């Protein structure tokens, strides 16, 4: 059976991921007029720029949907976001600033939950607004087929008939008006925005040019921290984790993870925390550029990693970072539920996150400028008395350290011999300007 349909399947049910914007509105109306039977599915992901979710399915019915459903995905989205924090599943960083994979997390949830809802309605053909140059077309393809093995894909934006008739936003707007809908195009921004309650992505148009900076962006989850006229007073905030799970902010305990994330967004957003500018590698190996917001994710991530470094040993922390980066790439590629990702997630959540219990106090200032004021945990292996510079009882003596250093002589001797070997083969210079300026002299002395 053909998985991807190049032309509209007339007379068949088609599920469309319906946002209520111009593109999906025009596509739904066009499909209905051409003889398909469209079903509209809207994901409530807690998008910060969406004012009225209930109105979206109503509009879909007006445009010809056979049925329209609003699927609440917020709880699952936050659960996956917390899992990503527990695992450090983030691989794109620039200058220490992290992209928290908020769009890939949203696609993992949307791609599974919407297709599951379609399957309940007997809808086995799915369309969405992703373009052939982006990451989402592959993410949705993978998640959709994982959820429904019988799924077929129809995307109007891959159909030459649709493109020939309604290939641009102006044409789509004129089409809607001609069909009796007073649809006015929104004012064109200098970039495109996609969001969910974990974060916002700003990209394309002017942001494709690297001489356009964050300063052209109007944040939807935070503030223009780069604008000195914007007053942002410093603020202290405490974050508490129990067994890897964020449970309290500023002493207030949350039983609802969605409400906790919304509050974390409000706190971090007041300062512009978690905003970053990234050049990344898309799934198809081409580079793209995005400016991201994720105030709540950033706040929780900072506190989580502070506890992590105080609780776990060096090798565990190294594995957390290495496996987290690997898992972040899998998430980015639309493989969040693949076996290799589940294996990494289980290991990191079981052996790392389970021990992360404690409270971190931070002072937030402007943007990503913050200080850690206090760290408290019953699981801390950081114990200042072990390495205090003050006189007192010690867990080891000067003689113990002398013995430990003496044992290092073996590998120091081996390293010296390797350096001589590198010099003899020309891989390493023995001149005074090299990294080991005394090597030639030592060799002459027979040492």
UniProtKB/Swiss-Prot annotation:
Superkingdom of origin: Bacteria
Pathway info: Amino-acid biosynthesis; L-arginine biosynthesis; L-arginine from L-ornithine and carbamoyl phosphate: step 2/3
Swiss-Prot/TrEMBL keywords: Amino-acid biosynthesis, Arginine biosynthesis, ATP-binding, Cytoplasm, Ligase, Nucleotide-binding
Binding residues annotated for ATP, in chain numbering: 17-25, 43, 129, 131, 136, 194
Entries under CDD domains matching the protein: ASS (cd01999)
Gene Ontology molecular function terms on file: argininosuccinate synthase activity; ATP binding; protein homodimerization activity
GO biological process: argininosuccinate metabolic process; L-arginine biosynthetic process; urea cycle
Keyword Protein biosynthesis: no
EC number: 6.3.4.5
Disulphide linkage map: none
Subcellular localization(s) per the UniProt record: Cytoplasm
Sequence positions that bind L-citrulline: 99, 135, 139, 192, 201, 203, 280
Root EC class: ligase
Known catalytic reactions: L-citrulline + L-aspartate + ATP = 2-(N(omega)-L-arginino)succinate + AMP + diphosphate + H(+)
Residues given in the record as L-aspartate binding sites: 131, 135-136
Gene Ontology CC terms: cytoplasm
Subunit structure comment from the entry: Homotetramer.
PANTHER family: ARGININOSUCCINATE SYNTHASE
Protein known as: Argininosuccinate synthase
Organism: Escherichia coli O157:H7
Taxon lineage: Bacteria, Pseudomonadati, Pseudomonadota, Gammaproteobacteria, Enterobacterales
The encoding gene: argG
